[in-house]
Design a protein with these regions (language model features):
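Core segments of cupin and vicinal oxygen chelate
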Residues: 25-27, 31-76, 105, 122-132, ...
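Bacterial N-terminal signal peptides
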Residues: 5-17
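Long, low-complexity, intrinsically disordered C-terminal regions of large eukaryotic nuclear proteins involved
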Residues: 169, 201, 243-247
Length: 297
């Protein structure tokens, strides 16, 4: 990370100028980060081995926290099939961050395992000690040393004007404004501490179709959240009143399986979903996902 780039912690969703709604609502918690990969099982195993986490809601995802089948749900990395995704670096969702107790030891471990390290450990000012790596499919990974907040830690966005839209993000997705190790912005406390950082970038490509495709929030009441965001001028890219997705989904098999697609189904304590999508004016693709049974439906 450049020492001259300004960073801000934000709740992601640049859509429009700040608009003050007349009513308030319960801000949805951050839910998941979606990565495009050519083969899901291999990607899941790579992250479990090199980054950490545990079994997620279904076999195509990794959870960072215990899966209980009820709110609050643990943060998850979700893998999706794509044969032509492009690297995430320089896009609206540039990188995903994970925290470790000893960064130097972790970087050495990754190097010994053949993981590509693109920037060695460094520390600038008050910021965390950090390094950058890249997974085999083009996702840029920031590694930080933050012993008090281990695991899935943050995402880094490239947006046009973080300062001008911080208040809008707080309105849309809650969180606490704070100065965090020299990074100004917002932090989430729903599932421990989680951050979304952003740096100014007028040229970032839209995230959709890249290695980090989108980020997601998990509202308890999807309809209420959608209606509230409409008062802020949000334009959605999918049906805003979706049916519940079945609790099973197809994922692709590896070459050793002849490329066959397999059906992964949720366990009895896992949940069907309702999902809507939107893309911000900065090109950040956003998903809103309602876990129906956990929401009491």
């Amino acid at each position: 990370m450049s020492s001259v780039s300004p960073w801000f912690v934000i709740a992601t969703l640049l859509i429009s100028p700040i608009v003050h709604a007349q009513t308030s609502y319960e801000a949805p918690p951050f839910d998941s980060i979606h990565l495009n990969v050519p083969e899901i099982s291999s990607a899941r195993d790579w992250y479990l081995k090199n980054i950490g986490g545990n079994a997620g809601e279904t076999a195509d995802r990794i959870a960072f926290g215990r899966w209980s089948g009820d709110h609050p749900l643990p943060l998850q990395i979700i893998f999706e099939m794509s044969s032509d995704m492009k690297p995430s670096a320089g896009t609206a969702i540039d990188s995903v961050g994970f925290s470790f107790r000893d960064l130097d030891a972790k970087v050495k471990e990754l190097q010994d395992s053949g993981v590509k390290i693109t920037s060695p450990p460094s520390k600038t000012g008050d910021d965390w000690k950090h390094a950058f790596a890249e997974d085999p499919w083009g996702t840029r990974i920031e590694l930080v040393e933050n012993p008090d907040n281990l695991g899935l830690h943050h995402v880094n966005l490239h947006v046009k004007d973080p300062n001008a839209t911080l208040a809008w993000y707080v309105r849309a997705f809650g969180g606490d404004r704070a100065s965090v190790y020299g990074r100004e912005g917002i932090r989430y406390r729903d599932l421990g501490l989680f951050y979304v950082f952003a740096s100014k970038d007028d040229m970032a490509a839209p995230s959709e179709g890249h290695a980090i495709d989108r980020i997601a929030w998990g509202p308890i009441d999807l309809d209420k959240t959608v209606n509230d965001l409409k008062t802020l001028g949000v334009m959605f890219s999918s049906d805003t009143n979706p049916r519940a997705n079945p609790a099973c989904n197809f994922v692709g098999g590896g070459t050793e399986e002849g490329g066959l697609r397999r059906l992964f189904c949720t366990q009895p304590n896992q949940l069907p979903h309702r999902i809507v999508y939107l893309v911000t004016t900065d090109g950040v693709k956003v998903e809103l996902v309602q876990h129906l049974e956990a929401a009491g439906h």
